[in-house]
A protein has these predicted regions:
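Non-catalytic, polymerase-adjacent accessory regions of viral genome-replication enzymes
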Residues: 1-26
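Short, conserved non-catalytic motifs in the polymerase core
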Residues: 17-43, 59-76, 136-156
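Catalytic "initiation/cleavage/transfer" segments centered on a nucleophilic residue
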Residues: 228-229
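Short, flexible active-site-proximal loops enriched in glycine and acidic residues
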Residues: 12-15, 55-56, 128-132
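PAPS-dependent sulfotransferase catalytic core
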Residues: 225
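Internal hydrophobic scaffold segments of catalytic domains
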Residues: 32-52, 110-113, 206
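Active-site-proximal segment of RNA-dependent polymerases
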Residues: 41, 45-103
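Conserved polymerase palm-domain catalytic core
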Residues: 75-177, 181-199, 203-210, 214-215, ...
């Protein structure tokens, strides 16, 4: 998952910031909210959770939500990641010889998702979440704060637009946060990549040029999909 090299956010009451190295270089700044801030963010996103979850198809393996007493929680990372790997293995093993494969990745995904984008997509129901994000922005947090579970939910509200763009082309895909694996005919897959580029530009972000490409064949598809280190922002805890 690509991102711009940035320094730490400014001091933020109710939060601390922690840097971790990214597999492709640079640092990723995680936001660690205090209990009050975490509770506020979760409550702000709570009215949106069911609506966002219902919009997601089975092609989305990560950051699925489940109801819980008094709120919600994210489905366990381990089983979801195992399902991702198993599904990719099955796809690459069973695909016809003429199948075309591709991968795509959103550049600086969380940092590119602005409060205004959430407001535009989710409407008045998102007012509290948008206000929370704007207050974070005033303290130097770009886009969605990386780390808190509610950010993952809001990311899916935006990234589902990429799912829809792919589906309109006839290509098929799986998505793990903003990491996308596509397959289909030699016409469908290039068309899907163009559609992704168009919808990303329209929404205000971009595909990562080094991580978005058509793959040479089934062997490369298997190697790329299953053989690389997990760079997801919701990698295993």
């Amino acid at each position: 998952m690509g991102g711009r090299a940035t320094g730490p956010p400014s001091r933020n009451e109710g939060a601390r910031f922690e840097s971790i190295p990214k597999p492709d270089g640079g640092l990723r700044w995680l936001t660690r909210l205090d209990p009050a801030g975490d509770a506020e963010y979760r409550e702000a996103v709570r009215p949106l959770v069911g609506r966002i979850e219902r919009a997601l198809g089975p092609e989305v393996l990560a950051i699925r939500t489940r109801p819980a007493p008094g709120g919600w929680h994210l489905a366990s990372w381990g089983p979801a990641r195992a399902a991702w790997h198993e599904t990719l293995r099955n796809i690459t093993r069973e695909a016809r010889r003429e199948t075309t494969f591709a991968v795509a990745d959103v550049y600086d995904c969380y940092g590119s998702i602005s409060p205004e984008m959430i407001d535009s997509l989710m409407g008045p129901e998102a007012a509290h979440a948008v206000d929370f994000l704007r207050r974070g922005h005033e303290r130097g947090v770009r886009g969605l704060p990386i780390g808190p579970d509610p950010s993952a939910v809001l990311a899916n509200a935006v990234l589902v637009e990429l799912d829809r763009a792919i589906q309109r082309t006839g290509a098929r895909h799986l998505r793990w946060v903003d990491d996308i694996f596509l397959w289909g005919s030699g016409g469908e897959v290039p068309r899907a990549l163009r559609a992704l580029d168009d919808v990303a530009a329209r929404m205000g972000f971009a595909l990562h040029p080094e991580k978005t490409r058509i793959l040479a064949d089934r062997d490369e598809a298997r190697a790329v999909a299953l053989g690389t280190r997990d760079s997801s922002i919701i990698a295993a805890p």
